[in-house]
């Protein structure tokens, strides 16, 4: 029998984390009342924390790309997100996987943090580029969008630390094996 790259448990973990991230960030956005700074920071903090924990749990090349694909499909099908976000999300994930490989691979202890950092950075940069293309008639609007994304990125940077802390606690509890 042929051994598959991802086993069933890892695929379930990726799917559960993708769905959890979408549900929790949507609840935070709805409870926060829109684009206020606290909900932006908290939403990105939770997203990055869960992504770091996922990358510690499933340490294989392609896990982030698969997570990104499942997350984008959930967003498209269930939440009515635009289909135009799927290519940029996949491209961001693939570039991040390349960055992780260039910095030593997935088995390194710092690989999940590097992956989450680069994924957030690349995906937010890609989102800003798409936003600029959409509002090129009034380029002054992009400065407001940059401010909103920068506030959210603060939460992403904080999420790196909380993700490492949560992964360490889950490792001590025996939930994360490596």
Locations of the language-model features?
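Short, Lys/Arg-enriched, disordered terminal segments
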Residues: 1-8, 172-178
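Membrane-interfacial segments
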Residues: 28-32, 36, 58, 62, ...
């Amino acid at each position: 029998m042929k051994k598959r790259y991802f086993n069933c448990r890892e695929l379930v973990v990726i799917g559960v984390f993708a769905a959890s991230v979408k549900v929790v960030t949507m609840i935070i956005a709805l409870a926060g009342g829109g684009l206020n700074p606290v909900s932006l920071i908290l939403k990105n903090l939770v997203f990055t924390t869960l992504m770091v924990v996922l990358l510690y749990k499933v340490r294989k090349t392609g896990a982030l790309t698969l997570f990104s694909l499942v997350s984008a499909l959930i967003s498209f099908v269930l939440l009515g997100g635009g289909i135009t976000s799927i290519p940029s999300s996949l491209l961001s994930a693939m570039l991040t996987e390349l960055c992780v490989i260039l910095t030593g691979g997935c088995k390194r202890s710092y690989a999940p943090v590097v992956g989450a950092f680069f994924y957030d950075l690349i995906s937010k940069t890609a989102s800003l580029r798409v936003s600029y293309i959409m509002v090129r008639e009034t380029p002054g609007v992009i400065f407001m969008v940059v401010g909103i994304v920068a506030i959210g990125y603060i939460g992403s940077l904080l999420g790196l630390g909380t993700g490492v802390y949560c992964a360490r606690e889950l490792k001590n509890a025996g939930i994360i094996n490596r």
